[in-house]
Regions:
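Long extracytoplasmic/lumenal interhelical loops at the membrane interface
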Residues: 202-216, 228-268
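Membrane-interface catalytic loops of GT-C/OST-like multi-pass glycosylation enzymes that act
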Residues: 31-35, 91-96, 140-148, 255-259, ...
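Hydrophobic transmembrane alpha-helices and their immediate junctions
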Residues: 125, 270-311
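Juxtamembrane membrane-water interface segments that cap and precede transmembrane helices
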Residues: 24, 83-92, 249-262
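Transmembrane alpha-helices of multi-pass inner-membrane enzymes
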Residues: 108, 153-154, 279-282, 300-360
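Alpha-helical transmembrane segments of multi-pass inner-membrane proteins
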Residues: 15-23, 40-48, 57-85, 91-164, ...
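Hydrophobic alpha-helical transmembrane segments in integral membrane proteins
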Residues: 191-206
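Transmembrane signal-anchor hairpin modules in multi-pass inner-membrane enzymes, especially those
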Residues: 1-23, 31, 52-60, 64-67, ...
Length: 360
């Protein structure tokens, strides 16, 4: 089994999170346990890519695979928008918000490939693809995606300054931090634009539809089932029950409260909420240690940005709960973290950087 460096913390986080989900499911009926077991299909890709990248040089395959997938998604979005500019663009996802989540995960890696590419033709193609991805992100009109991206840029800038030991006089650090802040400003302007376009205003009770009602109902579910919650996969049934459904609620078809911490608190109680919290924390530790260990700070910043954007988006939408978006997250995080550590040898196998020289 190849070494995986600080990615071991992410592995522990995944094990604790889904272990807590299995415990919560086992404490309820077979339906809940089955829903917990279903998550196997989501996180297995994380371990596959982690071990692949630790053992072999899969950089070219990943680069062109990610680029092809992103290009197909862009063509799909543009085709949907051309067919009906007023309709929601989804590109095969169940909703525009998971699509926006996937786009936010992907474009930082395309940006990285653009900065590293030396061949003029390919550099131009990556530039076109990057602009297309950002355009598709705007077409989703997802306020949560732009809010998450703005926060992700701000926190990534701060974290990378710490990682670079506060070298504010370094021109590359200044340039990257300035770029992140510009993107954050664009995200704020875009967020405000979409708020005005959807005529929701800035009132929390109206801006997010029935999100506040769903959060309040989820909290009541947890109050009644504090230790192991109502059971994985049972949120929809409980929310639309007479006991928990708000009288003012009109929206139909919600299967989660559009807030990942509250979803796992209500469905799995303290057990699952603790597992999710440790998952988020340990994953961050893995990404942070990888960023410190590598000399490729551009890649490290893009991996950190993808992770933080995904995390922040989880406060207003489904992220890790949505299987297609979650699989993309696990694949890119495993590849990104191991790429931060890996040094390619002549035989295309990979050795990890010597971490003994890195102060943790």
């Amino acid at each position: 089994i190849p070494q995986i460096g600080s990615a071991k913390w992410a592995v522990i986080g995944v094990a604790l999170f889904y272990g807590s989900m299995l415990i919560a499911g086992a404490c309820h009926d077979s339906h809940s346990l089955h829903k917990a077991f279903e998550e196997y299909s989501t996180y297995i890709i994380f371990f596959i890519v982690l071990l692949w990248r630790a053992r072999w040089n899969i950089d070219d395959g990943m680069k062109y695979g990610i680029a092809c997938g992103a290009a197909i998604t862009c063509v799909w979005v543009f085709a949907q928008y051309h067919a009906d500019p007023e309709a929601m663009v989804t590109a095969g996802f169940v909703h525009q918000n998971p699509l926006a989540t996937a786009l936010n995960l992907t474009w930082p890696f395309i940006f990285y490939y653009f900065t590293q590419e030396k061949r003029p033709v390919w550099k131009g193609l990556f530039a076109v693809l990057l602009v297309s991805l950002i355009s598709c992100l705007f077409l989703t009109t997802s306020r949560g995606a732009f809010m998450a991206l703005g926060l992700g840029c701000i926190f990534t800038s701060a974290i990378m300054i710490v990682v670079c030991h506060g070298r504010l006089k370094d021109k590359s650090v200044q340039r990257n931090a300035a770029a992140m802040l510009v993107v954050s400003l664009i995200c704020l302007i875009s967020f405000n634009y979409f708020v005005e376009e959807k005529h929701t205003g800035w009132d929390p009770d109206t801006m997010g539809g029935e999100r506040i009602m769903m959060l309040e109902a989820s909290y009541r579910m947890w109050q009644d089932h504090k230790m192991v919650g109502i059971g994985p996969g049972n949120w929809e049934e409980y929310y639309y029950s007479e006991k928990y459904h708000p009288k003012e609620g009109r929206e139909k078809g919600h299967v989660m409260p559009h807030n990942m911490p509250m979803l796992y608190l209500s469905e799995g109680g303290i057990v699952e909420a603790a597992g999710y919290s440790l998952f988020v924390l340990f994953f961050f530790v893995s990404v942070y240690k990888a960023a410190r260990a590598t000399s490729n700070k551009t890649l490290a910043a893009m991996v950190m940005l993808s992770y933080l954007t995904f995390f922040f988006h989880g406060f207003v939408d489904s992220t890790i709960f949505n299987k297609p978006a979650a699989r993309i997250f696990y694949m890119l995080m495993a590849y990104g973290m191991m790429s931060c550590y890996a040094v390619t040898n002549k035989n295309n196998s990979l050795d990890l950087l010597n971490q003994s020289s890195v102060k943790e």
